[in-house]
Amino acid sequence: MSDRLTLLRPDDWHIHLRDGAVLTNTVADVARTFGRAIIMPNLVPPVRNAAEADGYRQRILAARPAGSRFEPLMVLYLTDRTQPEEIREAKASGFVHAAKLYPAGATTNSDSGVTSIDKIFPVLEAMAEAGMPLLIHGEVTRGDVDVFDREKIFIDEHMRRVVERFPTLKVVFEHITTGDAVQFVNEASANVGATITAHHLLYNRNHMLVGGIRPHFYCLPILKRNTHQEALLDAATSGSAKFFLGTDSAPHAQHAKEAACGCAGCYTAYAAIELYAEAFEQRNALDKLEAFASLNGPRFYGLPANTDRITLVRDEWTAPTSLPFGELTVIPLRAGEKLRWRLLEEHA
């Protein structure tokens, strides 16, 4: 087994950078590895139109490290009030690459999300016509639904209906966590893809709950049982072009995670490709990592792959116990633990 792995520079097709002073930290972490990233729009207030997306984009560009060529790919936040014309304007901008459907209340800063998918059918029609992908946080939010069943029920009640009603609409099932989602994506048309996080490949709910509650494993969609973890590993390492890298790296300050009512999100951007390499190595599938990390996403979005390269080496190192997050700190996933792969260098 080789101790060195060179890949076309990957992209992150789902990340949260937050806003304000913390951008200096979060942008540096993502730009270290990735050429581009799909930037989640769930700010307060959310990114609802092309003008707001451009403002956020300029703040991200200003936070890039000196010499960085990292490109943020912006996303609109869909609400019950989004208009088809706003989709057409966003598409014409050239820098908005998708729109995100958050069911109201599904995750961090989703209170402004869509209350009923039927309300945005005219918007979805405009997206299909414009060729703009729809990114879906696929969980129902009703109080009578068990948190571990939210994804499966969303598939049955909503996903099937959306892809049948809009067969030409490109749909990304974001951060899938279940074998049910893997099966749905595999059986759907080529217009349906999915992102998978490193933490859902590496961990299951036992890691979060057995022997004490570990708040830094808490995310939404929540970690599932190990059989679902295995299904995700099968999908990611299958070679199927339908599945691609999306970290869902979602930082919260330490005090907001280590609390009586802690926030959902795992911070992985600081070592994302290293974590994915560990997951693929578990399956003896490092030869499949480049397609998953560097090729499948651009192909789905109709963008060229990056041409420069990164190199990973098998060289154990210890993850930091904390990282700066503006004036506060964030505890990264695997804080203080050993990682097996290290990012070495880039090639022109």
Swiss-Prot record:
Keyword Protease (UniProt): no
Cofactor: how bound: Binds 2 Zn(2+) ions per subunit.
GO molecular function ontology, one term from the record: zinc ion binding
Modified residues (N6-carboxylysine): 100
Keyword Cell wall biogenesis/degradation among record annotations: no
CDD domains xrefs: DHOase
Gene: pyrC
Binding site for Zn(2+) 1: 14, 16, 100, 248
A Pfam family per the record: Amidohydro_1
Name recorded for this polypeptide: Dihydroorotase
Description of how the protein assembles with itself and partners: Homodimer.
Active-site residues, as the UniProt record annotates them: 248
SUPFAM superfamilies for the chain: Metallo-dependent hydrolases
Enzyme class: hydrolase
One Gene Ontology term from the biological process aspect of the record: 'de novo' UMP biosynthetic process
EC number: 3.5.2.3
Catalysis performed (reactions): (S)-dihydroorotate + H2O = N-carbamoyl-L-aspartate + H(+)
GO cellular component, one term: cytosol
Lineage: Bacteria, Pseudomonadati, Pseudomonadota, Gammaproteobacteria, Pseudomonadales
Pathway(s) served: Pyrimidine metabolism; UMP biosynthesis via de novo pathway; (S)-dihydroorotate from bicarbonate: step 3/3
Chain segments annotated as transmembrane: none
